[in-house]
């Protein structure tokens, strides 16, 4: 059981700022957990499903630049989720590799 959602790295599809705000609030996520998502949203907008690949690459690059031991911000496990029409959600559990 996960008791602290901050113990994971997050690759979240940026459906929009309001959705990200709600995810952050409901899961009690620290703002930095969705930092890569918000950065990609501000730089490129909502690119549909391709967004998660851009966010995954952003997290990977930042992890390496910051000297983290894994590609997932130094964490072993993460979550990737995307939003679809009618507010459907697809979720994948990720296992990070060494940087």
Swiss-Prot record:
* InterPro entries according to UniProt: Chalcone/stilbene_synt_C, Polyketide_synthase_type-III, Thiolase-like
Single Gene Ontology BP term? Answer: polyketide biosynthetic process
Q: What class of enzyme is it?
A: transferase
Instruction: Identify the SUPFAM superfamilies for this entry.
Output: Thiolase-like (SSF53901)
Catalysed reaction, written as an equation: (E)-4-coumaroyl-CoA + 3 malonyl-CoA + 3 H(+) = 2',4,4',6'-tetrahydroxychalcone + 3 CO2 + 4 CoA
Q: Supply one GO molecular-function term.
A: naringenin-chalcone synthase activity
Tissues expressing the protein? Predominantly in developing fruit.
The annotated pathway is: Secondary metabolite biosynthesis; flavonoid biosynthesis
Keyword list, A-Z:
Acyltransferase, Flavonoid biosynthesis, Transferase
List the residue ranges forming a coiled coil, or say none. none
**Enzyme Commission number(s):** 2.3.1.74
Query: Which Pfam families does this chain map to?
Result: Chal_sti_synt_C
The family note in this entry says: Belongs to the thiolase-like superfamily. Chalcone/stilbene synthases family.
Alphabetized PANTHER family for the sequence:
CHALCONE SYNTHASE 1 (PTHR11877:SF80), HYDROXYMETHYLGLUTARYL-COA SYNTHASE (PTHR11877)
Q: What does this protein do?
A: The primary product of this enzyme is 4,2',4',6'-tetrahydroxychalcone (also termed naringenin-chalcone or chalcone) which can under specific conditions spontaneously isomerize into naringenin.
Q: Which named protein is this?
A: Chalcone synthase RJ5
- Which source organism? Fragaria ananassa (Strawberry)
Q: What is the lineage of its organism?
A: Eukaryota, Viridiplantae, Streptophyta, Embryophyta, Tracheophyta
């Amino acid at each position: 059981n996960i008791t602290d959602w901050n113990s994971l790295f997050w690759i979240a599809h940026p459906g929009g700022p309001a959705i990200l705000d709600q995810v952050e609030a409901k899961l009690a996520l620290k703002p930095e957990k969705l930092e890569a998502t918000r950065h990609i949203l501000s730089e490129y907008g909502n690119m549909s499903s391709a967004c998660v690949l851009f966010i995954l690459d952003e997290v990977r690059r930042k992890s390496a630049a910051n000297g983290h031991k894994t590609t997932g911000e130094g964490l072993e496990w993460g979550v990737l989720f995307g939003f679809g029409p009618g507010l459907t959600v697809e979720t994948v559990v990720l296992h990070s590799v060494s940087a």
